[in-house]
């Protein structure tokens, strides 16, 4: 497995563009795992007409920049949280399909398992975009639990 990364300020800009570029110079499948806000920020990269069929994009769509839900202080009054997280109800379906992608929608484990064969098909003649819809609050809670578990493991390891 070869891993390439493009990380800008807060990781939002250029991820899709970089993935299109990596796929353009590779004969292997190239996967981009990206949040919805990052995807929508850079989705014009798919418009350039040079997207190869070896590109696989997995968009985690939780209705905005849910990573920001984990930041302290966002329980502020008013619209602060909405503006910081850029909450939305959008989907990547129309854009992906208009650019010739095979679009796959995932809302649960059953639809995820059904989509995996298409996502991993090396003989596909079109790039694939798999959009996974999740709940922002659940995502933030799972992230907190994950980092807490890692912290506890390190504490136990260092004893």
Description of each model-found segment:
Residues 1-159:
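Thiamine diphosphate
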